Amino acid sequence: MRIPLPSPRSAAGLLPLLGCLLTGCSAAAPVPAPDETIKAATRALTDACLMRQGLTPPHPGESPPPTDEQQITAALFGKGPTELSLTLPTGYVVRAHTDGCLGAAQQRLYGDQRRWFRVSVIVNNLEAEASHTHRPLSEVRDRHRADLADWHRMRTRALSEATTVLNQPPFQGDMPR
C-alpha cells in the first residue's frame, strides 16, 4: 500500500507523520492544569462528604430540588455564624465557614483552612487593593510578598494532595490523613 505524501510546499504536513513514526503513534495523555486538578479533587471530596450525609451532590449547572437546596447548601458551605472573616483595604469584608464539606475539603487539600482563607482572599484581591490605594500593583505585590509565598506553598501542597485524592479509589479521597 502506498501512502500519499504531502507536496514539498506543505512540508509541515510531514511533521505529524514523522512524529507518529518515531513515537509509535502514541500520544501522551494531556496533563490537567493545577487549577483543574485542585478543582476536581475539591469536587470529589465535597461530593463524598455530601453523600455520607445522605445528600445527592448537585451536578454542575443544575440546581438541587427545592426541598433539598437548603440542606445541601448548609452541608456544603456550613451554617450558623461565620468563623472566618477578613476586612480588605477596600473596606469589603469576606467571610467563610470552617464547617461544611467545602471547609473539610480545603483543610484536607491546603492543610490549614484558616491560613488558606486569609492568603487566598488577600492574593485574589491584590488588584482591587492597588486600585483602591492608588498604588502600582507591583508595589502592592511587594508589600504582600509573605502572603504570596504562603499562597504558592499552600497551592503546591494542595496540588500534591489533589493528585493523591484523585488517584485513590472512589469515596476514599475524603478520609483524613
Regions found by a protein language model. Give the residues of each.
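Mitochondrial intermembrane space
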Residues: 2-11, 19-20, 25-177
